[in-house]
Amino acid sequence: MELNILNKTNNELEVELRGETHTLLNLLKDLLIKDERVVTAFYDMKYVSISDPVLYIKTDGADPILVLKDVVAIIVSECDEFIDVFSKAANA
């Protein structure tokens, strides 16, 4: 994965995620819009088969980079929890 910050202000962030698909971007967007600091979050893929997705985040004044880091930490935590639960079930 390559990540390119296209634009950043105090409350907005525009990030291109090269080589990624709807799978990761939908997950990020869904968790971002649940965060109370986020005013809006969405992504765009101009040409689905040839474009890299661009994630847009607008916050209520919170640093959008910190908000995105927090959301990624939630994803990592949920994946770790899944690994634990799955491992226990697989060994039962």
Curated annotation (Swiss-Prot):
GO MF annotation terms: DNA binding; DNA-directed RNA polymerase activity; protein dimerization activity
Catalytic activity: RNA(n) + a ribonucleoside 5'-triphosphate = RNA(n+1) + diphosphate
Location relative to the cell: Cytoplasm
Enzyme Commission number(s) from the entry: 2.7.7.6
GO biological process, any: DNA-templated transcription
Keyword Cytoplasm: yes
Listed CDD domains: RNAP_L
Coiled coil: none
Top-level enzyme category: transferase
Pfam families the UniProt entry points to: RNA_pol_L_2 (PF13656)
Keyword Transmembrane helix annotated: no
UniProtKB keywords: Cytoplasm, DNA-directed RNA polymerase, Nucleotidyltransferase, Transcription, Transferase
GO cellular component: cytoplasm; DNA-directed RNA polymerase complex
HAMAP family from the UniProt entry: RNApol_arch_Rpo11 (MF_00261)
Binding partners and assembly: Part of the RNA polymerase complex.
Function noted in UniProt: DNA-dependent RNA polymerase (RNAP) catalyzes the transcription of DNA into RNA using the four ribonucleoside triphosphates as substrates.
Similarity section: Belongs to the archaeal Rpo11/eukaryotic RPB11/RPC19 RNA polymerase subunit family.
Protein known as: DNA-directed RNA polymerase subunit Rpo11
Species, as recorded: Methanosarcina mazei (strain ATCC BAA-159 / DSM 3647 / Goe1 / Go1 / JCM 11833 / OCM 88) (Methanosarcina frisia)
Taxonomic classification: Archaea, Methanobacteriati, Methanobacteriota, Stenosarchaea group, Methanomicrobia
